[in-house]
């Protein structure tokens, strides 16, 4: 027997063909959401408050300080929030201290700071009753970046940019004349020496002393001449910078100093963030810049006078490591004191080293480092600017390297916590201005924190983010896999990110640093390709937001691959050589072969085993969760694998789903972490279990109660239904499944079914990827799904009186009311068809001038006889089904309703949809098709043992698409079915062709795994042997029921009076310009005239035509289309006197604008009137017309 048995949870064993020992379990797959939010609650929120506060008033006599904050209990539970369309949020209370500096008086007070949405255990938020997800954003990391560009003459120029988290950009660039310039905040460029002089180093010699001799420095100094001798060089430089930043304003050195301080050196206005400081220090660090250079001076320990490194030594990694302490300490540190006119007058500490130029061995190049400012320094320092300039000048000397912006060391993830902190900061900054004004205006003695704080800007910022940000998305809830994928999504779009139109090919492309961090397969097709990605299965964020991936460490001394796991970012990985997970190992953990396949900085090649530093932990660390669910992924073309991964996320939950015979072993973990199942929180014993709830007695005696969700409507209209898995008496461990969620079976993801599939053509019905299906799959509800739709009706107060929910509806027979209760609301369990009343509702009509008789009736019977019109909620087209639930909300019951609404009724209708012709089906390998024919079981081809085939696919769909994985799955699936086992074949480590044929033979199948098939209609065998097997097929969310649409009479557009378009508006089919040409070409003038008049916008014509058809009279001639009248009115509005004349030169009267207009938006009323008129004439008000 090939393979070995593996247990997945308590309910499923699979035969696994993996050969690689897994040394690391998959992390919790939604930790990117939950950990980030927890960090925000624990520390992120506190940091935001500490950033903005304390706030002083303008005279600095009062100060508002932050003390702490506390979250109280949420107002609603999760379930209540869903039912009431509320948000699941907790009130936050913040303690402030108001200090009066003149009197020393201190007032401390707790202030309510609004309701803050709280993340559920599943990593989602409930906002206004809907489940939402905050997608993590992939953005360019703050830091310093260097780039090179070649001009049209082939000359290489260099550029550099310091990008902060917030604040102004500082850029450097060279031109064709070898002069270096700087730009501040995208303004016009100035020589870089101007900025150096503004920083207080004004002499030419001083500048050369800092940066060393080079052509760029000399050329720039020559260009930067002293124009105004009455100013000092520093003042002149400051004025020049001010002129660039504020053109047209009077320039003084003082205003320029304060402007530059505000732009770069004030931590409130300029923020590199922790990650930016880390990146700047890492890039400008002297150790990486000295690596492999030849030192041109003796390095001497200042304290002892000992020579650490002699001139002429190559600074290899080992040399640098030997003097690392000195490099991090005071080795070659120089203190430069700026002159008195400088922007910042504190002394500037730099580290300077001289090395031999790599281009010209006779020249010496100076390397200037920023002496590693502390991590807490979030603004730029003059040392940073000088060190950046030095690196930039060194690039022209062949030192240092330019940055690749698409490298994942330069792109980071902003997860939920950080996005929320940014929003909160924006709100607090708006609040700060408000607070400062109130503190200054009001009387100091009576002020309390409560009085000066207005929380509205903060709550508005948070609300806006959750409600309308591009990154706050309605959760994709088609099935558990789509939930899980959505929570792990990484988007490069959104505020502060890229835009679709500007993103080029490079940003979207797969980069070598994506390995183990972002999935190279799973991304949408279309305009967002490559901009929306998914986290790889083992990906994990570090504290700076860079994605790490785990590797097994290789002990270089013994050559053994240890089980020690090291998490590396893309930057760190660049320094090492990493071997693949499938490298053969001996029993003792050493490499079995001298040469192994490995990667180093994007080069995939063979390496000697002795130079390998790390080994991948698992073959599936390259791909995302959805991709890791595709068996035989290694045999599929990547374009089709992309479709396969995306289509699994569109699978509809079936009534009785089955886990795949051929899985990958990911099904258990994906189901477990998705949040759709019920998972035990503690160990214990089941003491009660039914469909609605499970009770578990813990070992300490306390009782856990788990509620099972039954048929709740999911975000995408499918049934979210959980099924209990445990019985009374079962022993449960923490993490065990208590109930399956939708699309799960026995604790495993089960998106579809395992039908018997044959690759063969049949009467041409599977042309172009169409799917032929057996009627068995319809009759036995194999691909049946339940869909829930929600309809609501509300009663409001109108000017003419309140609307009412009632059974007494005008002009409706008793038959139509048979399923309504005494209030006029449909009963639960009623079967409804389109047009049936769900909630009876009447709205008062405008009173006409009453006749004497009517006034008398009013006086006698009170208000009863006034006119009302029927505004009942009816079942829309395609909405028939069974009433699953009715919820009623009224003010009397204490429900919160919108203003003006007295009562809200919600009706849920369940539909059972069997699979039918036109539904879309797919396998897991990107093989998708539409059901073209459902064939009776007796006509389907059958196997020699009499088993009819369930599905026939077109064999031509395989070769050109190069997704051979489906054929391998087919054969292995048949073997698994015959053996009665389930199989796991993990990606890149699955069943080999030998394993496949061994299993086929073990199952007693023919050696080619094909079989003779017999035609069900004739009983004759088909000419050739056919590949028949079991393939996992899923039904996708694109169902024909949602797309089929027909209209006879419906709403019209208000201005043009043409039918609306689209299924949602119950619109008509557009007969466009080209279609008109077709009828013109055939000379079909009458048909064309009908289409352009009656069937479109001839208002009176269509009424008369309707009347004529219902009475059986000849149809009258059409009139003038409404759109023509609109045209006439447009021309008249331009001042042109446009009239329409008939053939006898008499003016044709056009319908006037106000004629017959109602206050309704859409015009179906005219037709209704015609119907009523006809009904009165014939006087046959029978039950049957009532029912309709």
Swiss-Prot record:
SUBUNIT field: The RNAP catalytic core consists of 2 alpha, 1 beta, 1 beta' and 1 omega subunit. When a sigma factor is associated with the core the holoenzyme is formed, which can initiate transcription.
Example of a GO MF term: ribonucleoside binding
Alphabetical GO biological process terms: DNA-templated transcription
Domain of life where this protein originates: Bacteria
Name of the protein: DNA-directed RNA polymerase subunit beta
Transmembrane segments: none
Family matches, as Pfam families: RNA_pol_Rpb2_1, RNA_pol_Rpb2_2, RNA_pol_Rpb2_3, RNA_pol_Rpb2_45, RNA_pol_Rpb2_6, RNA_pol_Rpb2_7
Catalytically driven reaction(s): RNA(n) + a ribonucleoside 5'-triphosphate = RNA(n+1) + diphosphate
Role, per record: DNA-dependent RNA polymerase catalyzes the transcription of DNA into RNA using the four ribonucleoside triphosphates as substrates.
InterPro entries membership: DNA-dir_RNA_pol_bsu_ext_1_sf, DNA-dir_RNA_pol_bsu_external_1, DNA-dir_RNA_pol_su2, DNA-dir_RNAP_su2_dom, DNA-dir_RNAP_su2_hyb_sf, RNA_pol_bsu_bac, RNA_pol_bsu_CS, RNA_pol_bsu_protrusion
PANTHER family in alphabetical order: DNA-DIRECTED RNA POLYMERASE I SUBUNIT 2
Keywords on record: DNA-directed RNA polymerase, Nucleotidyltransferase, Transcription, Transferase
HAMAP family: RNApol_bact_RpoB
EC number(s) reported in the record: 2.7.7.6
Family, per entry: Belongs to the RNA polymerase beta chain family.
Organism: Streptococcus pyogenes serotype M5 (strain Manfredo)
Lineage: Bacteria, Bacillati, Bacillota, Bacilli, Lactobacillales
GO-annotated cellular components: DNA-directed RNA polymerase complex
């Amino acid at each position: 027997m090939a393979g070995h048995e593996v247990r997945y949870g308590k309910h499923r064993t699979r035969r696994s063909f993996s050969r690689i020992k897994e040394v690391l379990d998959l992390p919790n797959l939604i930790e990117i959401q939950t950990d980030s939010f927890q960090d925000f609650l624990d520390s992120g929120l506190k940091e935001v408050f500490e950033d903005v506060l304390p706030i002083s008033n303008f005279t600095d006599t009062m100060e508002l300080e932050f003390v702490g904050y506390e979250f109280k209990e949420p107002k609603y539970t999760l379930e209540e929030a869903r039912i009431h369309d509320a948000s699941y949020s907790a009130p936050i209370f913040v303690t402030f201290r108001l200090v009066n500096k003149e009197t020393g008086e201190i007032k401390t007070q707790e202030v309510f700071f609004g309701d803050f949405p709280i993340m559920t255990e599943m990593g989602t938020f409930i906002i206004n009753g809907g489940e939402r997800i905050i997608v993590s954003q992939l953005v360019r990391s703050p830091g310093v970046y260097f780039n090179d560009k070649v001009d049209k003459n082939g000359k290489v120029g260099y550029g550099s940019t310091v990008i902060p988290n917030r604040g102004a950009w500082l850029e450097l660039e060279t031109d064709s004349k070898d002069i270096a310039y700087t730009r501040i905040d995208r303004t016009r460029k100035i020589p870089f020496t101007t900025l150096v002089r503004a920083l207080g180093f004004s002499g030419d010699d001083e500048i050369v002393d800092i940066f060393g001799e080079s052509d760029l420095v000399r050329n720039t100094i020559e260009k930067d001449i002293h124009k105004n001798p009455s100013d000092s060089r520093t003042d002149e430089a400051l004025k020049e910078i001010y002129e660039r930043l504020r053109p047209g304003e009077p320039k003084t050195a003082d205003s320029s100093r304060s402007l530059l301080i505000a732009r770069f050196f004030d931590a409130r206005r300029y923020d590199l963030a922790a990650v930016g400081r880390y990146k700047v220090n890492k890039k400008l660090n002297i150790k990486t810049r000295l690596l492999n250079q030849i030192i041109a001076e003796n390095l001497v320990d200042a304290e002892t006078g000992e020579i650490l490194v002699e001139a002429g030594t190559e600074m290899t990694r080992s040399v640098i490591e030997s003097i690392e302490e000195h490099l991090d300490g005071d080795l070659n540190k120089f203190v430069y004191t700026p002159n008195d006119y400088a922007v910042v007058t504190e002394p500037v500490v730099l580290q300077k080293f001289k090395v031999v130029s790599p281009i010209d061995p006779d020249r010496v190049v100076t390397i200037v480092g920023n002496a590693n400012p502390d991590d807490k320094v979030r603004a730029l320092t003059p040392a940073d600017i000088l060190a950046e300039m030095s690196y930039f000048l060194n690039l022209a000397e062949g030192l240092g390297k330019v940055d690749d912006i698409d490298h994942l060391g330069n792109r980071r993830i902003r997860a939920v916590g950080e996005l929320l902190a940014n929003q909160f900061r924006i709100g607090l900054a708006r609040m700060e201005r408000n607070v400062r004004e109130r503190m200054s205006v009001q009387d100091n003695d009576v002020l309390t924190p409560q009085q000066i704080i207005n929380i509205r800007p903060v709550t508005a910022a948070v609300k806006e983010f959750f409600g309308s940000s591009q990154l706050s998305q309605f959760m994709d809830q088609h099935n558990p896999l789509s939930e899980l994928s959505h929570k792990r999504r990484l988007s490069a779009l959104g505020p502060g990110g890229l835009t679709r139109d500007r993103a080029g090919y490079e940003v979207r492309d797969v980069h070598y640093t994506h390995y183990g961090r972002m999935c190279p397969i799973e991304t949408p097709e279309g305009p967002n390709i490559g901009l929306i990605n998914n986290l790889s299965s083992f990906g994990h964020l570090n504290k700076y937001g860079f994605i790490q991936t785990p590797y097994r460490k290789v002990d270089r001394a013994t050559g053994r691959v240890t089980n020690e796991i090291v998490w590396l970012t893309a930057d760190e990985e660049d320094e090492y050589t990493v071997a693949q997970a499938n490298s053969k190992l001996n029993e003792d953990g050493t490499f079995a072969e001298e040469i192994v396949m490995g990667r180093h900085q994007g080069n995939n090649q063979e390496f000697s085993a002795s130079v390998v530093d790390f080994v991948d932990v698992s073959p599936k660390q390259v791909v995302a969760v959805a991709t890791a669910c595709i068996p035989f992924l290694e045999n599929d073309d990547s374009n089709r694998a992309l479709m396969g991964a995306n289509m699994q996320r569109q699978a509809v939950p079936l009534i009785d789903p089955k886990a795949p015979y051929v899985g990958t072993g990911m099904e258990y973990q994906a189901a477990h972490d998705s949040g759709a199942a019920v998972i035990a929180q503690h160990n214990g014993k089941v003491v009660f279990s039914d469909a609605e709830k499970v009770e578990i007695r813990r070992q300490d005696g306390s009782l856990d109660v788990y509620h099972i969700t039954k048929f709740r409507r999911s975000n995408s209209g499918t049934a979210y239904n959980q099924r209990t898995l445990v019985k009374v008496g079962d022993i449960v461990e923490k993490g065990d499944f208590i109930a399956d969620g939708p699309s799960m079976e026995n604790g495993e993801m089960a998106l579809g079914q395992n039908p018997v599939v044959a690759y063969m053509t049949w009467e041409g019905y599977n042309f172009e990827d169409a799917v032929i299906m057996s009627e068995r799959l319809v009759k036995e509800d194999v691909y049946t799904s339940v869909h829930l739709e929600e309809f609501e009706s509300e009663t409001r107060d109108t000017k003419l009186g309140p609307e009412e929910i009632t059974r007494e509806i005008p002009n409706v027979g008793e038959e139509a009311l048979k399923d309504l209760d005494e209030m006029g609301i449909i009963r639960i369990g009623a079967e409804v068809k389109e047009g049936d009343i769900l909630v009876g509702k009447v709205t008062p009509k405008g009173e006409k001038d009453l006749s004497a008789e009517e006034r008398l009736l009013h006086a006698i019977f009170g208000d009863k006889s006034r006119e009302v019109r029927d505004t009942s909620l009816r079942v829309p087209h395609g909405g028939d089904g069974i009433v699953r639930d009715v919820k009623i909300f009224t003010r009397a019951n204490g429900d919160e309703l919108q203003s003006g609404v007295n009562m809200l009724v919600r009706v849920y209708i369940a539909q059972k949809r069997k699979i039918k012709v036109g539904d879309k089906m797919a396998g897991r390998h990107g093989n998708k098709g539409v059901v073209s024919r459902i064939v009776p079981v007796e006509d389907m081809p059958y196997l020699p043992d009499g088993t009819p085939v369930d599905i026939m696919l077109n064999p031509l769909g395989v070769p050109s698409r190069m997704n051979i994985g489906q054929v391998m799955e087919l054969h292995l699936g048949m073997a698994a079915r015959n053996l009665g086992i389930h199989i796991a074949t993990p990606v890149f480590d699955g069943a080999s062709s030998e394993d496949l044929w061994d299993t086929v033979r073990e199952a007693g199948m023919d050696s080619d795994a094909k079989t003779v098939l017999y035609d069900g209609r004739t009983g004759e065998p088909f000419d050739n042997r056919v590949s028949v097997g079991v393939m996992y097929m899923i039904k996708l969310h694109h169902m024909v029921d949602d797309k089929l649409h027909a209209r006879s009479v419906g709403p019209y557009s208000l201005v043009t009076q043409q039918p609306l378009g689209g299924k949602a508006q119950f619109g008509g089919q557009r007969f466009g310009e080209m279609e008109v040409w077709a009828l013109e070409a055939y000379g079909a003038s009458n048909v064309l005239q009908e289409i352009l008049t009656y069937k479109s916008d001839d208002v009176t014509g269509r009424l008369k035509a309707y009347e004529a058809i219902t009475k059986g009279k000849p149809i009258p001639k059409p009139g003038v289309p409404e759109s023509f009248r609109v045209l006439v009115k447009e021309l008249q509005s331009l001042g042109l006197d446009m009239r329409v004349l008939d053939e006898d030169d008499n003016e044709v009267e056009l319908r006037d604008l106000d004629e017959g207009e109602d206050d309704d938006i859409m015009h179906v009323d005219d037709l209704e009137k015609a119907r009523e008129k006809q009904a009165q004439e014939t006087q046959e008000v029978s039950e049957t017309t009532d029912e309709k």
